[in-house]
Design a protein with these regions (language model features):
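N-terminal secretory signal peptides and thylakoid transit peptides that target proteins
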Residues: 6-29
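Interfacial juxtamembrane loops and adjacent helix segments
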Residues: 94-103
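Short, solvent-exposed interaction modules
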Residues: 114, 174-175
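Bacterial N-terminal signal peptides
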Residues: 29-35
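Long, hydrophobic/aromatic-enriched structural stretches that serve as scaffold segments
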Residues: 104-110, 114-131
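Iron-sulfur cluster-binding cysteine motifs and their immediate structural context
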Residues: 41-42, 46-49, 67, 71-90, ...
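Long, compositionally biased charged/polar accessory segments in the mid-to-C-terminal portions
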Residues: 200-297
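C-terminal segment of N-terminal export signals and the immediately downstream linker at the start
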Residues: 15, 36-70, 286-308
């Protein structure tokens, strides 16, 4: 455990009152049992509620149109007020990332946009013991930080390796793309994409566009199919590529919905926490009010400032 993690846990436990301790102690037994018995179907909405799948919000990425300009990355950071950083993977300040695949002989290459795939039946939501991740009726998979207990089951459950832990915060939480859920003009990345590699719309509309491109260009696209139409039960982010999907970082999935990926994570309870002591701190954090979290965060920030 890092020094920062130790400081966080120590501060949490030192602020416990007798009433808090009894509250936490009482929650441990029930919490361990409840988390271990999370249903694989109770927490995730598999069909997007009352809105038909074809009418839900989606994003289409055609890798053959992408020139690697990274306008999408910049737009995402600006719209979400994220810090600039030079990273090679998704993080608490990077929700989308353009990477380049190139074969060893240099004869084959392709760009690939990494981000949350917004699964039709998301394993991350199914694996979350407190319902901090939810598949909305409109399509995007959203994250509610106030519910999060920092267990990181979603990170284990996601077959795309998307959820990132934001260690820069006083309370490390999960961070990921929300498909610009509340943005009227659609995802910022798609709006900024001048080459036309990104298009936003309904899932039905985008599938039609993708299939029209396949039909108009026989042999151009890998397997003449759209990744995400059926893979892992389907996703709200649809992808076309000229090279095999595994070469651009997409996992080989069947058409079966993927919540079963969350089974491994939920079975790991409570060992991920390092035993009951670690779980105590996690449960305490989960039972804190927003005001308590803010107060402790300010205290921690002050202490860190004094040590610098």
């Amino acid at each position: 455990m890092s020094k920062k993690e130790n400081n966080t846990c120590n501060t949490c436990m030192s602020d416990l009152t007798r009433r808090d301790f009894l509250k936490v102690s009482g929650a441990i037994t029930g919490g361990l049992a409840a988390a271990s018995a999370v249903s694989n179907t109770a927490l995730a909405s598999s069909g997007g509620g009352d809105i038909p799948l074809e009418d839900q919000k989606a994003l289409f990425y055609d890798a053959t149109y992408c020139v690697g300009c990274r306008e999408c990355e910049l737009a995402c950071k600006e719209d979400n007020h994220l810090k600039e950083e030079n990273v090679d993977d998704l993080s608490g300040n990077t929700f989308t990332l353009i990477k380049l695949y190139q074969s060893e002989d240099g004869g084959e290459s392709s760009f690939r946009k990494y981000q949350c795939m917004h699964c039709v039946d998301p394993a991350c939501a199914t694996s979350c013991p407190v319902g901090a991740l939810e598949k909305t009726d409109e399509g995007p998979v959203l994250y509610e930080s106030l519910k999060c207990i920092g267990c990181r089951y979603c990170m284990q459950a996601c077959p795309y390796g998307v959820p990132a832990y934001d260690w820069s915060q006083a309370y490390p939480l999960i961070a990921k793309c929300d498909l610009c859920y509340d943005r009227h003009d659609g995802p910022a990345c798609a709006t900024a994409c001048s080459p036309g590699a990104l298009i936003s719309g309904t899932r039905g509309e985008l599938l039609k566009i993708a299939k029209e491109r396949i039909a108009a260009n026989p042999g151009k696209y890998y397997e003449d199919r759209v990744f995400g139409e059926h893979d892992g039960g389907g996703t709200s982010v649809l992808i076309l590529s000229a090279v095999s999907f595994d070469k651009i970082g997409l996992p080989p999935l069947t058409e079966k919905a993927i919540p079963h990926y969350g089974e491994t994570a939920t079975r790991a309870v409570p060992y991920i926490f390092g035993g009951a002591a670690g779980f105590t701190a996690i449960v305490y954090r989960a039972t804190m009010t927003a005001e308590e979290r803010q107060r402790l965060g300010k205290k921690q920030g002050k202490e860190e400032g004094e040590t610098e």
